[in-house]
């Protein structure tokens, strides 16, 4: 009987933190079969800094296997003294093709990879490391944003000074504070230390909690991204925090936790290197998963000297993940993958274009329009997805429609013919069930501004009696689109989530909770997408962040309006300023940005920022209806794709880039087969079967 192979793993990781461990995950059962929760832990080397190693047995029947290295940390929810530490994924290798070991070829005397030291995140000439997504039901990622007029001081001695802010998480159950700060670390691990804050708050100590501290905290370190500086990448905080100036800076703090109900934050104010004030955000201050809170700022005399406004967002695990185990598989990831091509991609806006406000013959966001764009050579088609009252996905752009309602004839009026006494009333898509959307008669919301329903310029939302098949349904579900749109065309799924506008109005009040909303859409994609090429996009930056923290298979691009005179801008500066949008996309590790053509034709600086961080550059906007403008973006700005109406009209029908590439690969393979030595008869038979 053949003996098992011995496979050696040794990896150097220069940026591993003191509290992190390195695991290996891969195609072998001993490596977890791509499940990170079943990955194999490596041992830290005692004589080589930041180096980890392990040896595993591989059955002799295995000739090849694949693997990746991951960085993890353990957090303890400390619930009823019975909970076990939970593994949290910090970073992982995300090159498209995982590492390969041809163990049958590489092994000598049954031992493979004995003298190989891998570099974490680097393989085959590529370097790519990405933040981990949420793996556990109890795990959450908390984002704190401090920006705008966040600080207000009513004590004169504190006003008109420049402050540095630092955010430290703590567990409200313990008087000690766990420190990840390097100067507090002994034996290369985080430590619990008695907080000087608690010591100063009580004379006799009666109000101090003295529960025994667990060996591990329930929270991670807090890292920082500054969107208004040149380097927006998340990283460790300085010991005395980062400069914050009202109406100038935008600070984003990020922490993971496995005990959200016990997590609080201490905001430390520094003037130079001296701490001069504190503020606290307690669990009770965060009543939902998305909102804002105002906390008092306490000075050195323990008296309030001002207050600070903080926005927060809490991202939770996709509750449908356990129904589709492939979501957590590390075998393949496209979250940061993009193949650069010489040809700029053409993306059909809502299929063939905006039909309810422009003179376009195909009803927008229908299966027919999406397929027509694909038939005319679109590489991707863009479509809009939102939810109905009964939590069903629906492909439709606007948050509201006009519903035709038949009124009663008044007693004094002359009876009217059936259907004549109708009026249009505005109603939100979220307040209608999918069945109602497919039953009632609707007009586009633009008709509320006086546009005639008989106008030849735009189509009615409700199709005519001759358009009764599924292809022309104005409210198809996302599943219908995934099943019936040409599989050769990529899908740019724009997720519609309402936002506040600069004039104080809101696109659609009382909308769905963000985690619930995103989970439903991601679950439908996971169930029906198959091997489709998919890119998500959204104007709401927090939705973009959520998607990256709930899955890693599909990439995300941030939609931005930027500086504009055509539309009412959003309140959120991340969507209002393309430079900050590019920084946001880089910091959150998105694939790229969908820039608005209006701003880029005036200022190309956002393109330069995107290129600096390797972001993919898409462009949308009415300017792109001009062939000359399209040529300008292609030749002068070297963008990766354009999103526009009427794709392929007035042109000879062509195939999209993916069809052409597949055809070229097939032709190349056929030629290589033809030029190779003739196979044996048995081989010919096998080839015929395959």
Curated annotation (Swiss-Prot):
EC number(s) stated in the UniProt entry for this protein: 3.1.-.-
Keyword vocabulary terms for this entry: Hydrolase
Record-linked Pfam families: C2_GDE1, CBM_20, GDPD
Domain GP-PDE per the UniProt entry, residue ranges: 344-654
Enzyme class: hydrolase
Gene Ontology MF term list: glycerophosphocholine phosphodiesterase activity; starch binding
Keyword set includes Hydrolase: yes
Domain CBM20 positions: 1-122
Keyword Hydrolase: yes
GO biological process: glycerophospholipid catabolic process
InterPro entries, per the entry: Carb-bd-like_fold, CBM20, CBM20_GPCPD1, GDPD, GP_PDE_dom, Ig-like_fold, PLC-like_Pdiesterase_TIM-brl
Region called Disordered, residue ranges: 670-690
Biased segments, Low complexity type: 676-690
Family: Belongs to the glycerophosphoryl diester phosphodiesterase family.
Name of the featured protein: Putative glycerophosphocholine phosphodiesterase GPCPD1 homolog 1
Organism the protein comes from: Caenorhabditis elegans
Gene: gpcp-1
